């Protein structure tokens, strides 16, 4: 893996030099855009809207529109805005890991100590495991400030970017009916169904089936075969009574 950021994790007066590596990888198929008439590749060009000529990449700069003009922002300006956050993941507090709502999660990154046999790294990793806590921190990655949690995963300290509170939309925008009454009998049956389906989390057994099926179709078409299209068979509910549906679901699970 290639590191995408080099800096340090700071907590208290302790500074741990680390490298950051992306912990996730895309499984999407790499599809090219083609002209349907001759299957030639589609190319996008960076065109100057005044001269209508293509602009070399090294001549492109970033600008912010301010009072009908543009202020040009250079790499040094991004770093000057928060020099310490560009190089340090400063832990501001420790929180219960389970208290972080999954809605806030974004991307995760592995950290690796920049030096071998780094005792401070080993200490923080072990302390996070023992305490069940996660460090809450802020840092700048790719010119964007991110809130993040610093938490242990097996033998690595992981930095997971999380959203700021203002990025989460308020549920008041939804048309939700809070006046629906659920009977105790229905609730008990719902809880029984949840317990029936409850099992230890094993994400490794879940595969990207859509990706696999799409790849099968591509391989069939490459061989000149017509792919077999599976028709969706909608599940029919047995009646409109919620209790009966829950009871039937329990029976189906037991007989599986």
Annotate each PLM feature.
Residues 1-256:
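Boundary segments of small protein-protein interaction reader/adaptor domains
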């Amino acid at each position: 893996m290639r590191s995408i950021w080099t800096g340090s994790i700071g907590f208290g007066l302790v500074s741990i030099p680390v490298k950051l590596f992306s912990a996730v990888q895309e499984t999407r198929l790499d599809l090219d855009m083609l002209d349907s008439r001759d299957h030639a590749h589609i190319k996008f060009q960076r065109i100057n809207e005044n001269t209508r000529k293509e602009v070399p990449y090294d001549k492109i700069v970033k600008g912010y529109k301010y009072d009908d003009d543009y202020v040009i922002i250079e790499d040094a300006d991004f770093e000057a805005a928060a020099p310490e956050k560009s190089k340090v993941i400063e832990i501001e507090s420790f929180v219960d890991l389970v208290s972080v709502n999954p809605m806030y999660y974004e991307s995760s990154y592995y950290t690796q100590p920049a030096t071998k046999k780094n005792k401070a790294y080993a200490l923080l990793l072990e302390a996070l495991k023992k305490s069940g806590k996660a460090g809450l921190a802020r840092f700048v990655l790719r010119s964007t400030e991110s809130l993040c949690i610093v938490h242990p995963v097996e033998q690595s300290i992981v930095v997971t970017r999380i959203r700021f509170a203002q990025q989460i939309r308020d549920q008041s925008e939804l048309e939700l009916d809070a006046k629906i009454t659920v009977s105790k009998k229905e609730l008990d049956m719902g809880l029984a169904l949840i317990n029936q389906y409850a099992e230890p989390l094993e994400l490794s057994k879940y595969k990207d089936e859509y990706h696999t099926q799409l790849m099968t179709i591509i391989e069939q078409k490459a061989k000149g075969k017509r792919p077999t299209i599976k028709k969706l068979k909608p599940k029919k509910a047995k009646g409109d009574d919620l209790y009966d549906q829950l009871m039937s679901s329990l029976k189906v699970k037991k007989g599986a």
